[in-house]
């Protein structure tokens, strides 16, 4: 089929997809008036001290840090697909209040997301994201124990790092949080199944052969993928402020980023790295109403990690850290405690 033919098919399908977005808007508009997050400063993370880390292929990653470099433990947060570091706002607030100077936090925008640089299509892979995470850890927390917490694509990034840098899990990383994620691709379930249609295929073809056209037609292009992600974000009715923030992060993500990462999300498989992750305390958490990565994927992941804590969040959608922050924050507290304990045990073993 010619490019124009594929684009014709794409345009003909937008009415149906737009109606899905309309359902999301109606649900948001019907939320209760008592605003839980009225006055919440969701830009607080963006005012933290900033640095830039260059990846091995020259992409600048924007990194922000909270806490003293002398803190006994650092937590590195890795966000998911079509999000940015602000997706961790409620966890940043909680960890700062709960742990104070005992825990330092590092946040960054993944390549092609937020304020970080735009990569080429061929480097939009989970493997490359793993190398990026390794670079952030090396430059921003060069010594001391580290807990890594990844959501969605950020969890996949963390598992990729285990494949590439098992030495970090033997020496530095003392805990791993895997939220709403999977070790293998999405082509069989969740988001992958939703993306198996000729509309998405047409748009992928256009992104490969005519990226200028795709970027110019970004309004039309967003109607392909974003309604699926919006509908899957929450399993329950949430605060309008949270819905607005997640919408804004999605809307500000480049169309090319949205498309260029689809292939790797569907096909990646880092299952061979799970024994490395199994050597440190781990948390596996997912909502059982997640339509992007189903809870069954988290069950399978936890079964492969000896001693993993599996947390099932009843009614939770894909943005579970926004939707059920109390449950997520409590689970993170337990992971941090286990990370501290693992570090103490490792030091004692080294002395013996």
Q: Which residues are covered by each model-predicted region?
A:
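Hydrophobic alpha-helical topogenic segments used for membrane insertion/localization
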Residues: 2-30
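Conserved HGGG/HGGXW glycine-rich cap/lid loop of the alpha/beta-hydrolase fold
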Residues: 59, 64-118
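Active-site glycine-rich loops that stabilize anionic/oxyanionic intermediates
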Residues: 80-84, 152-153, 182
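Active-site loop/oxyanion-hole signature of alpha/beta-hydrolase fold enzymes
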Residues: 104-156, 163, 168-169, 330
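Flexible "cap/lid" loop of the alpha/beta hydrolase fold
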Residues: 163, 167-214
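Conserved alpha/beta-hydrolase catalytic His-Asp/Glu region
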Residues: 212-276
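Short beta-strand/loop motif that positions the catalytic acidic residue
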Residues: 277-278, 284-286, 290
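Catalytic active-site module of serine/aspartate enzymes centered on a nucleophile-bearing elbow/loop
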Residues: 306-352
